[in-house]
Amino acid sequence: MSKAFNNLAFDIMTAVSFDTDFNTMEKPEYRFALKAIEDSNVRLGVLLQAPELSVRSLDKKLFPTAYVAKYKFVKFIRMVMAKRLAASKATSKDIFSFLQDCKDPDSGKELSIAELSTETATFIVAGADTSSTSMAAVSHYITGSSNCYRRVAEEVRSTFCSVDEICLGPKLNSCAFLRACIDEALRLSPPGGSALWREVEQGGTLIDGTYVPGHCEVAVGIYSIHHSAAYYTKPFTYDPERWYRPLDAKGSRSEAPRSPYMPFSVGPRSCVGKPLAIAQMMIVFARLLWEYDMRRADYKSDWAEGDYSSTEYALKDHLTAWKEGPVLRFSPRLKP
């Protein structure tokens, strides 16, 4: 599923960014761009934690494959931009068209071609790679136990009368358990779970009562926060019910704490694509659950009956995340 979701997320983000359908779900022609992103991210992930490795181009010697991949992706972006610039600006409402209209509030200058290239490349890498990881994680967790799968499938199938009804709106928003499954998957397997370093401003600051001098870099890994017993009961167990509770006697929900929950980071540099990512996952899994019965390929009759799976979807930190699997079987469901 990791490869399938890579293709799907790439197709969605390139369509949103450039109003272009590369259809990598069905055709292999442009899948090299996905491989280039994956290979290039290995180097970037290391440099994020150890930027000194870039001195005298040491990283080029350590990661030759990543360097080749970088130029392949740059070449792809230039090709896409050339086609997009040749198209009429007025006919598209993609991200690229909005970037073309951006102007510096002080100078009034528009973005240069190089700046447009950088911004759109960032949208594709950040949007496609993280979304595909999130969807792969959700598919792993909801197929990990009969309890979870049956409940989320029943919620979707009882909410919509046909697959054509599945779209953004009140009905989809009412699928609270599906949203809880997504939130819990993002807690256990955040697509960007490493430490995102920030430099302390001149003069220093107090962090939780400890003075940190200016120009020091500080960070805490999102993965470690999400797995802290200080915030979550049984932090290594997949339990979507921690995000979903029936109304209690006082009419309020009892939910897990939101403040330490940060799969999209926090603050002014948090992910601007969060609403798009959540909407994308809600629609994708609502449609999959309505159309198909899903099982893991190694499905057995003792399928974690009545329990949630404690097996974590493993990720490797490559700037965003490298993943593999799960392997699932799909069969068209018998509709009433």
UniProtKB/Swiss-Prot annotation:
Enzyme class: oxidoreductase
Molecular function (Gene Ontology), one example: heme binding
Gene3D superfamilies: Cytochrome P450
Record InterPro entries: Cyt_P450, Cyt_P450_CS, Cyt_P450_E_grp-I, Cyt_P450_sf, Cytochrome_P450_monoxygenase
EC assignment: 1.-.-.-
Record: residues binding heme: 271
Record's protein name: Cytochrome P450 monooxygenase lcsN
Organism: Purpureocillium lilacinum (Paecilomyces lilacinus)
